[in-house]
UniProtKB/Swiss-Prot annotation:
Name of the protein described by the UniProt record: Cytosolic Fe-S cluster assembly factor Nubp2 homolog
Manner of cofactor binding, per the entry note: Binds 4 [4Fe-4S] clusters per heterotetramer. Contains two stable clusters in the N-termini of Nubp1 and two labile, bridging clusters between subunits of the Nubp1-Nubp2 heterotetramer.
Keywords: 4Fe-4S, ATP-binding, Cytoplasm, Iron, Iron-sulfur, Metal-binding, Nucleotide-binding
Source species taxonomy: Eukaryota, Metazoa, Ecdysozoa, Arthropoda, Hexapoda
Gene giving rise to this polypeptide: Nubp2
An annotated GO BP: iron-sulfur cluster assembly
Entry function: Component of the cytosolic iron-sulfur (Fe/S) protein assembly (CIA) machinery. Required for maturation of extramitochondrial Fe-S proteins. The Nubp1-Nubp2 heterotetramer forms a Fe-S scaffold complex, mediating the de novo assembly of an Fe-S cluster and its transfer to target apoproteins.
Length: 259
């Protein structure tokens, strides 16, 4: 049911634990705060975290004639969400599936969700380059997705995996919108000064090397972390923090390019 979607953006990461799902959810919330109609599709079948991050755990999806009806975050229906997390009885249930079953589920997510008219569909993918990614790329060929945002941390180990992600995108013909460097520095919750507790600048260097845009550098900010599970937009709750400014900049750049 992607014919009602104007723009499709994938969010990728080379490895787990880099904050990809947090970036996906906050980007979706940022776009919805800008009065766009947004969908967020969580295809991380083995680790669906979007329902938790948006405070939607316990919500159910139901069927209509057109397919699955997504869960909406509010009565305005500015943000619609679909995740396998809504289909599991318990959050701790493990999804132990082989490739063909995963492929079938992802195809169903891409073809059988009854999205209303959307300006943007953000697709939160699993880490790495697996069967799920290949299935998504094949399904999106017909609708010409806008591209992918790649999330990394500045450490060399994460950067090595992101290099593979960049190669994967180029080989599959997916446009790279840009790279986001996450968890770069720590913001003191008292004085808000940012200190580099690990290495920094790796995402910037990789973007230059791969000749793709660097979209921004996000620090570790306890105030932003406290929003997890609330479904609240960082740009609304913490408008002056660095993370909000970067997220708004990414959303503005995306909407400016597509207008």
């Amino acid at each position: 049911m992607l014919e009602k979607v104007k723009h499709i953006i994938l969010v990728l990461s080379g490895k787990g634990g880099v904050g990809k799902s947090t970036v996906s959810t906050q980007l979706a919330l940022t776009l919805s705060e800008s009065k766009f109609k947004v969908g967020l599709l969580d295809i991380d079948l083995c680790g669906p975290s979007v329902p938790y991050l948006l405070g939607l755990e316990g919500h159910d999806v139901h069927q209509c004639e057109e397919g699955w009806v997504p869960v909406y975050t509010n009565a305005d229906k500015n943000l619609a969400v679909m995740s396998i997390g809504f289909l599991l009885k318990n959050r701790t249930d493990a999804v132990i599936w082989r490739g063909p079953k995963k492929t079938a589920m992802i195809k169903q997510f891409l073809e059988d969700v009854a999205w209303e008219d959307l300006d943007y569909l953000i697709i939160d993918t699993p880490p790495g380059t697996s069967d799920e990614h290949i299935t998504v790329m094949e399904c999106l060929k017909a609708v010409n997705a806008d591209g992918a945002i790649i999330v990394t941390t500045p450490q060399e180990m994460a950067l090595e995996d992101v290099r593979k992600e960049v190669t994967f995108c180029k080989k599959t013909g997916i446009n790279i919108i840009g790279i986001v460097e996450n968890m770069s520095g720590f913001v003191c919750p008292n004085c808000t000064e940012c200190t580099n507790i690990f290495s920094s600048g790796g995402g910037v260097a990789l973007a230059e090397l791969a000749k793709v845009p660097h979209l921004g550098t996000l620090p570790i900010d306890p105030r932003v972390g406290a929003l997890a599970g609330s479904g609240k937009a960082c740009v609304k709750e913490l408008p002056d923090c660095t993370t909000s400014k970067i997220l708004q900049s990414i959303a503005d750049n995306i909407s400016a390019e597509k207008s």
